């Protein structure tokens, strides 16, 4: 099959420069670090070039939402008990930031992947004056 395989693993107190902390790991691996302040947690979360998904666990809902809003990732899960971490509504777009930011899937963001946005600015006359006609 190729590639590396690792059994489901939880890595505790991962060093900041470790590959499992700085790069995306696709597989059953959870890298865990603790932080003393919100600022430290946000700085660490945003220090990587990747931003596919992050999780904030806290017993304080206001703190969890405050931190989640500051993390640069395509999906941030805020939870107090780990429930619902993968429960997403299909109307919610999925995609990452930074080096993980290759497009979006699902939701309005996914729809926009298949459209071209164009702005036309008219000055000095109204659209009624221009007698707009359908061109397609």
PLM features: what roles do these ranges have?
Residues 5-136:
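Conserved C-terminal structural/oligomerization subdomain of aldehyde/semialdehyde dehydrogenase
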């Amino acid at each position: 099959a190729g590639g590396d395989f690792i059994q489901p693993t939880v890595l505790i107190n991962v060093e900041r420069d470790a590959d499992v902390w700085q790069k995306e790991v696709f597989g059953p691996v959870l890298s865990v670090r603790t932080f003393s302040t919100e600022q430290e947690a946000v700085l660490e979360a945003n220090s990587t070039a990747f931003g596919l998904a992050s999780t904030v666990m806290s017993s304080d809902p206001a703190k969890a939402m405050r931190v989640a809003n500051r993390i640069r990732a395509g999906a941030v899960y805020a939870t107090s008990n780990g429930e619902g971490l993968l429960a997403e509504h299909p109307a919610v777009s999925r995609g990452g930031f930074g080096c993980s930011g290759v497009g979006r899937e699902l939701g309005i963001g996914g729809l926009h992947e298949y459209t071209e946005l164009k702005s036309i600015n008219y000055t000095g006359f109204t659209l009624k004056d221009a007698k707009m006609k359908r061109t397609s």
